[in-house]
Amino acid sequence: NKRNYQKELEKLIDQAQKDNKIPSLFLHSCCAPCSSYVLEYLSKYFNITVFYYNPNIYPEEEYRKRVHEITRLVNSMESEHPVKLIEGHYDPQEFFRMAKGLEDVPEGGERCFKCYRLRMEEAAKLAEEGGYDYFTLFLYTSDAAD
C-alpha cells in the first residue's frame, strides 16, 4: 500500500484554500536545477523559505557556484507568493566526519543516506524553530541521485 504524496499535497492545498490561508513552507534545496519546477509549482500555494544547506559539496569554489545559482533562481523567478532564501552554514568537515569509514561505499549507498539524514535533521530543526506550517525537501529529482 504505497502512499501517493501528490494526492496528499493536493488535499493540503485544497484545505488551505478553503480556509483562505497561505501556509508557510520550509524547503531544503539540494541545487537550483532541481529546485526550479518545485518552486514554480509550490509558490502558487505556499509562502516558501528555501534552505540551502549542503556541506557535502566540495571544494568551496563549487559550493559558492551552487549558492550563486540558487540565489539567482530565487531572486529572478516570478512567484505568486513570497519565496526567500536562507543559506545554512558551510562546513565540509561536518560531511567528512559523517562519511569517515564510508569513503569506498558506492554512490547511492550508506554514505548517501547518512548525508541525506545530516541535511534533513538540520533543516527539520530550523523549520521547527521558525514555526513553519510545513517542512519538506527534495533530494531525489536528479538522475544523479538514483
Where are these regions (language model features)?
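A conserved beta-strand->alpha-helix junction
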Residues: E78-R97
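Conserved adenosine/adenylate-binding substructure
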Residues: E103-Y134
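Histidine-anchored nucleotide/phosphate-binding helix
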Residues: P33-F46
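Conserved small/polar residues in nucleotide/adenosyl-binding loops
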Residues: Y140-D146
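A short beta-strand-loop structural module common to alpha/beta enzyme folds
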Residues: T49-I57
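Core alpha/beta nucleotide-donor-binding catalytic domains of modification enzymes
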Residues: Y63-S76, F95-D104
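Non-catalytic terminal extensions that flank enzyme cores
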Residues: N1-L27
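Residues at the starts of beta-strands that form the adenosine-phosphate
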Residues: S24, N47-T49, K84
